[in-house]
């Protein structure tokens, strides 16, 4: 569940311009494969034009999310990752 979102700085590009990311605070319900500790935040680009993902915030919609962890353990998601609302999955 995505609880909240905010725009954060993620360093600078090669020209010194700040790189923005959307930081989603999430409530992890279950981990199928990944680190032992709960994921608290997921990062994505700020627009779908640069492969950013938009999640419903407020904690009502549950998602199955497959993303990538960077070297610092931060979880990142893009449009190419598997991200579907939980209630659309079949058994």
Swiss-Prot record:
Which SMART domains does the annotation name?
Answer: NTR (SM00206)
Q: Which GO terms describe its molecular function?
A: metalloendopeptidase inhibitor activity
**Major subcellular site:** secreted
Q: Which UniProt keywords apply?
A: Disulfide bond, Metalloenzyme inhibitor, Metalloprotease inhibitor, Protease inhibitor, Secreted
Q: InterPro entries recorded for this chain? A: Netrin_domain (IPR001134), TIMP (IPR001820), TIMP-like_OB-fold (IPR008993)
Choose one Gene Ontology CC annotation of this protein and give it.
Answer: extracellular space
Pfam families xref list: TIMP (PF00965)
PTM remark: The activity of TIMP2 is dependent on the presence of disulfide bonds.
Where is the protein localized? Secreted
All copies of the NTR domain together span 1-91
Which Gene Ontology BP terms does the record give? Answer: negative regulation of membrane protein ectodomain proteolysis; response to cytokine; response to hormone
Source domain of life is: Eukaryota
What the protein does? Answer: Complexes with metalloproteinases (such as collagenases) and irreversibly inactivates them.
Give the similarity note: Belongs to the protease inhibitor I35 (TIMP) family.
Q: Which PANTHER family does the record associate with it?
A: METALLOPROTEASE INHIBITOR, METALLOPROTEINASE INHIBITOR 2
| UniProt protein name | Metalloproteinase inhibitor 2
What gene name does this entry carry?
Answer: TIMP2
């Amino acid at each position: 569940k995505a609880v909240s979102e905010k725009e954060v700085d993620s360093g600078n590009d090669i020209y010194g311009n700040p790189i923005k990311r959307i930081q989603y605070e999430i409530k992890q319900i279950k981990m199928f494969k990944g680190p032992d500790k709960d994921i608290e935040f997921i990062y994505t680009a700020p627009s779908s034009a640069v492969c950013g993902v938009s999640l419903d915030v407020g904690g009502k919609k549950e998602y199955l999310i497959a993303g990538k962890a960077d070297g610092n353990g931060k979880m990142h998601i893009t449009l190419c990752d598997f991200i579907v609302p939980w209630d659309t999955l079949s058994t």
